[in-house]
């Protein structure tokens, strides 16, 4: 990814940068990007001082989303080349803890918009897709078990075999627990947003991180269930064009997303809980103004 930079000019900013993985860019009317001011690149490539809103017709889309799965997201590269963005179409970076509250917090009446955490929404989106895909695989797996025989001795219907009903039960177990945990996490998120609104305070940051812990594990549980079903179903579902293939490709790509890395978020939470800075985070903390 090229360095993203902007220069402050009269009435706004001139912005230049290259952004990969911009999901939905082909159908968007406006796109949102973060830029660093020319004199503030201390955090390197990911430095972000200002979030901008840029019309679709002022950017170039490079169709480079040539990946194994999730092709429908259209997560292509977007190039911004010396585009002027007026100041009223920008907000400060949400990475800056010393900045004033976002003006949009006062626009909507719903507590999730007025007090909710952005990370909670993003993590829930990815996790729900993982669980939905796992349920799709579960449907295929049940159909397979009901209609096929085993391929090794004893040659019996899979429903009568000692192991296949158990494999199905284990898959249901993992998916049901993941879904129930996600729904409860979402309920806890909304409850905390309402409490924060009633008490005129920020969303509890420790709870926010714990909710993220839950959601990432939910996605992993769904993925583990999919791998169990894929492995025990045999090669029957691996034919070209089979829905099994599509689900496997999509799940494998989904699990590479940075919002479904449970080990990383567990390390992040644990270090903060014991008063330590997350690894490499020192450069991302701006100095108090």
What do these predicted regions represent?
Residues 1-11:
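Well-ordered mid-protein domain cores that form the structural environment of catalytic cofactors
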Residues 233-289:
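Glycine-rich phosphate/cofactor-binding loops in nucleotide/flavin-utilizing enzymes
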Residues 143-147, 181-185, 224:
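Extended, amphipathic, non-transmembrane alpha-helical segments
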Residues 179-217, 230-238:
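C-terminal helix-coil-helix/basic helical segment that borders enzyme active sites and/or dimer interfaces
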Residues 128, 132-135, 169-176, 212, ...:
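Generic structural signal for well-ordered, non-transmembrane alpha-helical segments
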Residues 18-59, 63-64:
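DPxDG-like acidic metal-binding loop motif
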Residues 12-16, 78-81:
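Generic recognition of long tandem-repeat/solenoid scaffolds
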Residues 68, 75-175:
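Glycine-rich beta->alpha junctions and the first turn(s) of the following alpha-helix
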């Amino acid at each position: 990814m090229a360095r993203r930079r902007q220069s402050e000019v009269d009435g706004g900013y001139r912005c230049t940068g290259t952004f990969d993985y911009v999901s939905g860019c082909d159908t968007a009317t406006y796109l949102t990007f973060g830029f660093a001011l020319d004199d503030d690149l201390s955090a390197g490539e990911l430095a972000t001082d200002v979030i901008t809103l840029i019309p679709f017709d002022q950017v170039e889309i490079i169709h480079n989303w040539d990946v194994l799965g999730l092709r429908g997201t259209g997560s292509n590269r977007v190039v911004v080349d010396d585009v002027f963005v007026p100041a009223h179409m920008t907000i400060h970076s949400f990475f800056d803890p010393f900045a004033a509250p976002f003006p949009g917090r006062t626009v909507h009446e719903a507590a999730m918009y007025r007090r909710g955490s952005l990370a909670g929404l993003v993590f829930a989106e990815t996790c729900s897709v993982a669980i939905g895909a796992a349920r799709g695989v579960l449907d295929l797996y049940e159909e397979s078990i009901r209609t096929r025989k085993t391929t090794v001795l004893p040659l019996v219907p899979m429903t009568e075999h000692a192991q296949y009903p158990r494999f199905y039960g284990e898959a249901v177990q993992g998916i049901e627990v993941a879904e129930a945990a996600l729904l409860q996490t979402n309920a806890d998120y909304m409850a905390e947003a309402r409490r924060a609104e009633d008490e005129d305070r920020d969303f509890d940051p420790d709870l926010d991180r714990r909710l993220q812990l839950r959601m990432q594990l939910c996605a992993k549980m769904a993925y583990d269930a999919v791998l169990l079903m894929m492995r025990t179903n045999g090669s029957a579902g691996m034919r070209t064009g089979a829905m099994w293939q599509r689900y496997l490709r999509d799940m494998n790509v989904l699990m590479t997303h940075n919002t479904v890395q449970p080990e990383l978020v567990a390390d992040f939470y644990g270090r903060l809980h014991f008063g330590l800075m997350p690894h490499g985070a020192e450069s991302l903390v701006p100095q108090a103004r």
